[in-house]
């Protein structure tokens, strides 16, 4: 008795034909069945393999059927948008591996050089050509295989990975600005210096800059360009409503990296103690804030509009010249080529408190330009007087644009000059008069762009 039964001679069931269904009823029935099966498999794939699946189907009536493993709909739309923009990062994607790699030195040829790579694999169904000897009747049965192709895309950098640079907020009403030179003591700054290539002619601003810079307001000896600063043409200074004395800001470390260049103890006894001012910007030390327009009058400290000094700066008349001095002489005094110093004699200088001229009369003028009498800086832009206890300071800042670092006398130490070394005619009740100090306001050797002289009455 033969234990092994003979092989079955019954023909095997033919493979299912994959062809277009012409009958509308059968087509709708097959669509519903296959659609539910596809969605079921997509759900199983998302649960078993931690995959995010979105299935989108358009039927013959152009109706859309969508399944998403991500809920709610916003996450589904975000997933589709990621694919359209290629805004995702694939973990260690491998490119086409070359089997003929001679050594390990060429492994980087098939690995991505850029870490931010989006890998997209596209699948397609193609007929299988394995049965080349099949009869014509067998060709009616579809034999296909699934093939895939992978492409790599460089993804855009996200905002969180961008290098954080301190932004500069500019109000809408401020339309015109002047580029200011950088201080040589500034370190680690990301703000570009004044516009222009200072190779041969430092007084010619760059044509690509959108800001107007008066050539006479730039000093070639005081304009510096840092090696580590990105080259950008548009430099907009930081606007601050209040000026504080150097070293008095509570958040000094966050606002500037400027250090003192000289110690108060190292200064000679004949020179008053000097404090340095800054503008609360990381790239500017000793520069000035903006002053109002000549036609706007006095600014209320509570008002927000601040108009910088524009191209009409050269048309401002000097405030301290005698009335009988003609306009031609005024221009000669303040010509950039004429180094003549302006001499202003206050008739009652010795009677002024603390040796300072009245706030509305004292103006610090550079050789580049002068300020008009009605161009008075608002009080909120003056020195913060709360930190000075010995001798309060009251000074205005009408025309400091165009100068770089300026050291001003903010505190007078009368005890620093022994009275025994001063002639008797310059002592009043044993105390030196103000005329002893008045010529020491500005160090002309350090800052040649500021030209001021005072004579005792």
From Swiss-Prot:
Q: Which GO terms describe its cellular component?
A: cytosol; M/G1 phase-specific MADS box-forkhead transcription factor complex
Q: Where is this region: Disordered?
A: 195-278, 295-328
Residues with the Phosphoserine modification = 372
* Residue stretches of biased makeup (Low complexity): 199-216
How is the protein altered post-translationally, as described in the entry? Phosphorylated. Occurs periodically during mitosis.
**Localisation per UniProt entry:** Nucleus
Where does the record place the MADS-box domain?
Answer: 11-71
Extent of Basic residues compositional bias:
265-278
Does Nucleus show up as a keyword for this record? yes
Q: Which UniProt keywords apply?
A: Activator, Cell cycle, Cell division, DNA-binding, Mitosis, Nucleus, Phosphoprotein, Transcription, Transcription regulation
Q: For bias kind Polar residues, which ranges apply? A: 218-234, 295-317
Which Pfam family, just one, is annotated for this protein? SRF-TF
Which terms does the UniProt entry file under GO BP? cell division; positive regulation of transcription by RNA polymerase II
Give the protein's recorded name: MADS-box transcription factor 1
Supply the source organism for this entry.
Schizosaccharomyces pombe (strain 972 / ATCC 24843) (Fission yeast)
| Gene designation per UniProt | mbx1
């Amino acid at each position: 008795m033969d234990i092994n039964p003979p092989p079955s001679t019954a023909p095997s069931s033919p493979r299912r034909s994959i062809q277009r269904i012409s009958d509308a009823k059968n087509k709708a029935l097959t669509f519903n069945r296959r659609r539910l099966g596809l969605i079921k498999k997509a759900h199983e794939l998302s649960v078993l393999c931690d995959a995010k699946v979105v299935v989108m189907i358009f039927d013959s009536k152009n109706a859309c059927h969508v399944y998403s493993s991500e809920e709610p709909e916003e996450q589904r739309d975000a997933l589709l948008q990621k694919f359209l923009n290629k805004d995702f990062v694939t973990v260690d994607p491998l490119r086409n591996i070359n089997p003929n790699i001679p050594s390990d030195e060429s492994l980087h040829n098939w690995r991505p050089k850029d870490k931010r790579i989006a890998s997209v694999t596209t699948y397609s169904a193609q007929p299988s050509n394995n049965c080349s000897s099949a009869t014509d009747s067998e060709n009616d049965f579809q034999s296909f295989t699934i093939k895939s192709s992978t492409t790599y895309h460089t993804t855009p950098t996200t905002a969180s990975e961008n290098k954080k640079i301190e932004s500069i907020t500019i109000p809408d009403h401020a339309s015109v600005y002047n580029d200011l030179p950088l201080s040589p003591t500034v370190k680690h700054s990301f703000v570009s210096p004044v516009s222009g290539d200072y190779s041969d002619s430092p007084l010619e601003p760059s044509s690509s800059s959108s800001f107007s810079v008066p050539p006479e307001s730039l000093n070639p000896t005081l304009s510096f360009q840092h090696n580590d600063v990105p080259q950008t043409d548009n430099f907009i200074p930081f606007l601050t409503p209040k000026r504080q004395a150097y070293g008095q800001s509570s958040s000094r470390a966050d606002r500037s990296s400027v250090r003192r260049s000289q110690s108060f103890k190292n200064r000679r006894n004949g020179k008053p103690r000097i404090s340095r001012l800054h503008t609360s910007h990381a790239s500017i030390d000793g520069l000035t804030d903006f002053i109002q327009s000549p036609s706007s009058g006095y600014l209320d400290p509570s008002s927000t509009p601040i108009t910088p000094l524009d191209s009409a700066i050269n048309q401002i008349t000097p405030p301290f010249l005698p009335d009988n001095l003609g306009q031609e002489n005024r221009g000669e005094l303040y010509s950039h080529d004429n180094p003549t110093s302006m001499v202003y004699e206050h008739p009652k200088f010795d009677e002024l408190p603390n040796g300072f001229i009245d706030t509305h009369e004292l103006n610090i003028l550079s050789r580049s330009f002068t300020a008009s009498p009605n161009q008075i800086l608002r009080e909120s832009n003056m020195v913060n007087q709360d930190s000075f206890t010995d001798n309060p300071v009251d000074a205005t800042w009408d025309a400091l644009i165009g100068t770089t670092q300026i050291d001003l006398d903010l505190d007078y130490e009368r005890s620093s000059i022994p009275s025994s070394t001063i002639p008797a005619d310059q002592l009043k009740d044993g105390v030196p008069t103000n005329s002893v100090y008045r010529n020491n306001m500005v160090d002309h050797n350090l800052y040649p762009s500021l030209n001021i002289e005072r004579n005792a009455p």
